[in-house]
Structure formats: C-alpha cells, structure tokens
Amino acid sequence: MATVGIDHIAMPTANAERLIQFYKKLGFTINDEAEWRSGTANIFSIQIGDSKINVHPEGYTASYKGPTAVPGCTDICFVWEGSVEECQKMLSDSGVEVIRGPGARKGARKNGTLPAVSLYARDPDENLLEWMIYT
C-alpha cells in the first residue's frame, strides 16, 4: 500500500465572490457553488482533474484546518496540456498577468526528470499560481 496522489488541498479566501469569478474565467469548474450561495454548504471547491481545492470563505471556522492559514498563503502548480503559447494566451485572454516565465523548471513527473517550462501568476488573494508545461 502507498500514498498515490492528492485528493484535495484547502485554502482560505478574503473574498469568495472575487475568487469564484477569477477561477471560472480560467475555465475551472466550481463545485458546490449553488449550495454555498444558499447556505447549505460552508465551503465550495475548485475542481482540477481528479483533485480539488477546498476554498474556506471569509468567516469560515473549522477545527481541522491549518492554524496559521491566511488568504494568500497558497502556492499551487497546475499542469497545462498544450503549448506555452496557448497557456500564455489563455492567461492573457482571462486578464491574468504573467509575473514570471516562461522558464525551465523541474516538475514532479518521472521524479523530476521530464523537461518542463512554467509560467507564474497570482490570484485575487495573491496566492502564487504556476502552470507547468511538460515539453
């Protein structure tokens, strides 16, 4: 038996509405948005393949969360299936500024041996976002 992946991570936000709109513009699916809006769910999540980011909206309290987690504390690397140019266009079309890259990076695939290039940006809470493109 072994740990084989990440099911979800969690991050707090200072402005849930702004975060939902930002990630929707980038093409992500927001899970449980309607339930969160109606008050039947305390959180919503951003779906990424078979994993998700649970978003803790402002005012959310739970006993099982990072005790020092604050909006902007998260660093996430997404995998982009396409070219660097296509990723740059997607970000530009979504109004997202690339703050660094493209540049060569060491990703996780094949224990860091696959060549990759990445681009960096920030979301509305100032979380660091990276898009990894395996070449």
Regions found by a protein language model. Name each.
Residues A2, S45, V79, Q88-T135:
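Vicinal oxygen chelate
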Residues K52-I53, T61, E97, A104:
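Active-site/binding-pocket entry motifs
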